[in-house]
From Swiss-Prot:
The gene is lysS. The lineage of its organism: Bacteria, Pseudomonadati, Chlamydiota, Chlamydiia, Chlamydiales. Its cofactor is Mg(2+). GO terms for biological process: lysyl-tRNA aminoacylation. One of its GO terms (molecular function) is magnesium ion binding. SUPFAM superfamilies: Class II aaRS and biotin synthetases, Nucleic acid-binding proteins. Binds 3 Mg(2+) ions per subunit. This is Lysine--tRNA ligase.
Length: 527
């Protein structure tokens, strides 16, 4: 049996629910179907804030502009024959004035034993959604205000709002009940407006540069394209195991084979792994592939894209301050070109280790001495994996300004071409870092089907020998598509949520997701 939700026994819920019957008896329509022809608060302010509107007497004579808008009542105070309120519409508020002689309540019976102003004072509550028809004026202090001619109750709020001054301090409540967070904090609302704007900017930039947006399956028979554990489910219609995608890469490359020269997808990806300040199991990525480009051209494209986004949200400045870096606020300049270093150069620069002069055994000793890795973690590691581990443990946190770290060990990915110089120990891959976190991953894509099969089979064999590792299946359809012929191409993937964190100055990835992954709600516990 499902436990009874505790809010159903809250005093404010019971008190406000009782008012519903009273409102109905007074002739007020509960939960009307529409309130057409509304302005937004933002539009009203933009249109009229700089105009000469006159005072409340001019509004009383109906000689000022008439407006219709709707929103949530978030502040109310009675003052003699007038009462003032604040109406919240998304992330903007407008002051309203209710007048004893001027304001009426839509639907209130003419023979009701309560005046409109008393109805407003006694029957409305903070949190109610109201429709407002009225006339604009400026108060003596210069505040744009609407003298309410008619107020319409559009939705009765049965639960009280968070305290206006204290707000929501409990992060658990903020993330689980995001609607309260949005109502009580304009800053939170602005963050999500900016997130939507950033995603729109990304799409517009990609479209303007000739990329075609495509959609590929979220549910897949075979997962791949990244080193990650998938979420699994069962498709009843086919009696088969399915996976939520861990990457967009494989499906996009199949489309590239089909002839689309520039493609991208911006969508959800799922990885059944850890949760922390910069990781959520469900997250948004953009992956893009451009025929006839290589990783150097992709590098230029990525830094120009990010610079464009920074300028767009930062008043055309390329430099912004991120307040939540681990050592305190940090100013970062995203103006292209960004710093470029090979992985080996970055280890020499930031860790003081020239890997070329050390044996594998010496690199293992350095890792043992300078990191918290258990010795067993790299006892049988190849040289390339040792180099990658040195970078991850000793370098990445130091990359504060935007960096492209290029030429990674071949062991780090089976999907990338080796260096054209002939050094087969390293691949044409770069990762972009900022504030110690990875922003982008990019390759000169491997399009040799024979070599691709060899690498995937080698990876599969190694994974089978490791009992705790995720053994990815080999996607034969992908290999068949490569045999059809895929043009040389450059590709990249960017974690959109992590980028939005920086651009909105958010402390955690949870602050830029409407509903981040949380533990399952237990109705038996206190809300």
């Amino acid at each position: 049996m499902t436990a009874r939700a505790e809010y159903l026994d809250h005093e404010d819920f019971l008190y406000r629910s009782h008012k519903l019957q009273e409102l109905s008896e007074l002739g007020v329509v509960l939960y009307p179907y529409e309130f057409p022809g509304v302005f937004s608060c933002e539009d009203i302010k933009k249109t009229f804030a700089s105009q000469e509107l006159g005072n409340s007497e001019a509004a009383m004579s109906r000689s000022t502009p008439r407006v219709r808008f709707a929103g949530r009542l978030v502040l109310f105070r009675a003052m003699g024959k007038n009462a003032f309120g604040q109406i919240l519409d998304h992330n903007q508020t407008i002051q309203v004035m209710f007048n004893r002689e001027f304001t009426s309540v839509h639907g209130l019976s003419e023979d009701a034993e309560i005046t409109p102003i008393k109805f407003i004072e006694k029957k409305l509550d903070l949190g109610d959604i109201l429709g407002i028809d009225g006339y604009l004026f400026f108060t003596h202090s210069g505040e744009l205000t609407v003298l309410v001619e008619t107020v319409t109750l559009l939705c009765k709020s049965l639960l009280s709002l968070p305290d206006k001054h204290a707000g929501l301090s409990d992060k658990e409540v903020r993330y689980r009940k995001r609607w309260l967070d949005l109502i009580s904090s304009r800053e939170v609302s602005d963050t999500f407006v900016k997130r939507s704007y950033i995603i729109k900017l990304i799409r517009n930039y990609m479209d303007a540069h000739g990329f075609l947006e495509v959609e590929t399956p979220i549910l897949q028979n075979i997962y791949g394209g990244a080193e990650a554990k998938p979420f699994t489910t069962t498709m009843e219609a086919l009696h088969s195991e399915m996976f939520l995608r861990i990457s967009l890469e494989i499906a996009l490359k199949k489309i590239l084979v089909g002839g689309a020269p520039r493609i991208y997808e911006l969508g959800k990806v799922f990885r059944n792994e850890g949760i922390d300040r910069t990781h959520n199991p469900e997250f948004t990525m953009i992956e893009a592939y451009a025929a006839y480009m290589d990783y150097k051209e992709v590098m230029v494209f990525v830094e120009n894209l990010v610079e464009h986004l920074v300028r767009a949200v930062n008043h055309d400045n390329t430099s912004l301050v991120y307040s939540y870096w681990k050592h305190g606020p940090q100013e970062v300049d995203f103006k292209a070109p960004w710093i470029r270093m090979t992985m080996k150069e970055s280890i020499a620069t930031y860790a003081g280790i020239d890997v070329d002069v050390h044996s594998d055994q010496k690199l293992k000793e350095i890792l043992k001495k300078k990191t918290t890795f258990p010795e067993t973690a790299f006892a049988t590691a190849s040289r390339g994996m040792l180099i990658a581990a040195l970078f991850d443990e000793l370098v990445s946190d130091n990359l504060i300004a935007p960096h492209h770290i290029t030429d990674h060990p071949v062991e780090t990915t089976p999907l990338c071409k080796t260096l054209r110089s002939g050094d087969t120990a390293f691949v044409e891959r770069f990762e972009s870092f900022c504030l110690g976190k990875e922003l982008c991953n990019a390759y000169s894509e491997l399009n040799d089907p024979i070599r691709q099969r060899e690498l995937l089979e080698q990876q599969h064999t190694k994974k089978e020998l490791l009992p705790d590792s995720e053994c990815h299946p080999i996607d034969e359809e992908f290999l068949e598509a490569l045999c059809q012929g895929m043009p040389p191409a450059g590709g990249f993937g960017i974690g959109v949520d992590r980028l939005v964190m920086i651009l909105t100055n958010a402390a955690s990835i949870r602050d830029v997701l409407y509903f981040p992954v949380m533990r399952r709600f237990d109705a038996e516990k206190t809300n």
